[in-house]
């Protein structure tokens, strides 16, 4: 579905047409805006994504889509995925999300603690309110750090799983992909709890009152 919409949008877009100015403003920054696959199922969103690409990138994308579709038509019945392929798909999707979960939890804990010890004491906000503000800081940081995490995952040398077009569309592939993301986030969030090791319990600092 997404590939068909992309092909139609690429065919309707002239290769040398300039990118609209408002899209340039949307893409200012170190990394381009991240587009999720499910966001490309609507024609307008797909067209906006295609318009944001440079002519060279648009040509490469069109060529790759046409090659993919031709392989799909030429290939017969898809061979079953092996256990090694499923493990690699899971690992390939888990590694980037370990970084996402780690940064999200670590920044939230560190920021929430500092907010509680500074602004929280001044304004008298609760611990949950400080945690919510820490989560806000973590989400804002994630907007800028997501691209760097993806770039680091690519530098680790993990190649895209070598699958046929029909194997890509198998339900086993999608399940392994989602499981890898879930496991990666879980591991990353657990590792991201490390700031708690450096936070002393405030209750231990308070002098204990002698019971009468």
From Swiss-Prot:
KW Protein biosynthesis (keyword) present: no
**Transmembrane region(s):** 89-109, 117-137, 140-160, 179-199
The free-text tissue note of the record is: Expression is restricted to the heart (at protein level).
- Say which domain of life the source belongs to: Eukaryota
Which BP terms in the Gene Ontology apply to this protein?
Answer: cardiac conduction; cardiac ventricle development; heart development; regulation of cardiac conduction
**Localization:** Cell membrane; Mitochondrion inner membrane
Extracellular topological domain = 110-116, 161-178
Q: Which InterPro entries match?
A: TMEM65
The residues on the Cytoplasmic side of the membrane are: 1-88, 138-139, 200-212
How does the UniProt record describe the way this protein sits in the membrane? Multi-pass membrane protein
One of the Pfam families matching this protein, by short name: TMEM65
Classify the main location: membrane
GO CC term, one of those recorded: mitochondrion
Q: Which UniProt keywords apply?
A: Cell membrane, Membrane, Mitochondrion, Mitochondrion inner membrane, Transmembrane, Transmembrane helix
What happens without the gene?
Morpholino knockdown of the protein causes pericardial edema and altered cardiac morphology in 4 days post-fertilization (dpf) embryos and severity increases as embryos age. Morrphants are not viable by 7 dpf. Hearts showed abnormal cardiac looping in the morphants and a significant decline in heart beat rates seen in after 4.5 dpf and continue decreasing at 5 and 6 dpf. Ventricles show a significant reduction in amplitude of Ca(2+) transients in morphants between 4 and 6 dpf.
On assembly, the entry states:
Monomer. Homodimer. Interacts with GJA1.
Role, per record: Essential for maintaining proper cardiac intercalated disk (ICD) structure and function. May regulate cardiac conduction and the function of the gap junction protein GJA1. May contribute to the stability and proper localization of GJA1 to cardiac intercalated disk thereby regulating gap junction communication. Regulates mitochondrial respiration and mitochondrial DNA copy number maintenance.
Q: Which PANTHER family match?
A: TRANSMEMBRANE PROTEIN 65 (PTHR21706:SF15)
Its name, as the record gives it, is Transmembrane protein 65
């Amino acid at each position: 579905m997404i590939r068909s919409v992309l092909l139609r949008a690429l065919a309707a877009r002239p290769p040398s047409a300039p990118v609209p100015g408002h899209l340039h403003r949307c893409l200012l920054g170190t990394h381009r805006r991240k587009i999720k696959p499910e966001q490309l199922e609507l024609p307008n969103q797909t067209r906006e994504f295609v318009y944001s690409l440079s002519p060279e990138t648009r040509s490469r994308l069109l060529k790759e889509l046409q090659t993919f579709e031709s392989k799909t038509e030429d290939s017969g019945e898809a061979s079953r995925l092996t256990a090694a392929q499923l493990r690699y798909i899971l690992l390939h999707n888990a590694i980037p999300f370990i970084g996402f979960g780690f940064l999200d939890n670590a920044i939230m804990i560190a920021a929430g603690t500092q907010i509680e010890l500074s602004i929280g004491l001044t304004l008298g906000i609760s611990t949950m309110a400080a945690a919510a503000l820490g989560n806000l800081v973590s989400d804002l940081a994630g907007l800028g750090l997501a691209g760097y995490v993806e770039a680091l995952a690519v530098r680790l040398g993990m190649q895209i799983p070598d699958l046929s077009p029909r194997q890509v569309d198998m339900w086993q592939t999608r399940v392994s992909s989602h499981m890898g993301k879930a496991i990666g986030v879980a591991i990353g969030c657990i590792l991201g709890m490390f700031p708690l090791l450096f936070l002393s319990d405030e209750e231990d600092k308070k002098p204990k009152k002698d019971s009468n």
